[in-house]
Regions:
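Short, structured surface patches at the beginning of a domain
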Residues: 1-123
Length: 123
């Protein structure tokens, strides 16, 4: 399953731009987004307290989660690292469209995740 995750911080913001960007990204990778999850929530809220937490618990090995920016997952590096770690451990692919990050089961992804982890430790 391929999921596009859209998060805005306030009701006044619209997720349409995020959805368009994810759709274009998916098409460029010859992927079809099967499901969209949209929520209005602060990125400072824990993923457990948002739809994202439910989504992460339901994803299975080889599923793909696409976000426009890593900050859509969380605003804190520690939370981002935890989310990325869960995805890597469970074999869930994670793509960010703007930064161009691709977290999958490759050695490059693991090295990048490790580097993010070091930064989180320093903070």
């Amino acid at each position: 399953m391929i999921i596009g995750y859209l998060r805005v911080s306030t009701e006044k913001q619209h997720p349409a731009n995020q959805q368009d960007e994810i759709r274009r990204f998916a098409e460029s990778k010859q992927l079809i987004v099967n499901h969209w999850v949209t929520e209005v929530a602060s990125g400072k809220k824990s993923e457990r307290d948002r739809k994202l937490g439910v989504l992460l618990r339901r994803l299975k090995r080889d599923d793909t989660l696409i976000v426009t920016e890593i900050s859509r997952l969380s605003r804190t590096l520690t939370d981002i690292m935890a989310i990325m770690g869960k995805c890597l451990e469970r074999g869930i692919n994670l793509y960010t469209t703007k930064e161009g990050y691709s977290f999958d089961n490759t050695i490059n992804s693991k090295v990048l995740c490790f580097a993010f982890g070091l930064v989180a430790e320093i903070e």
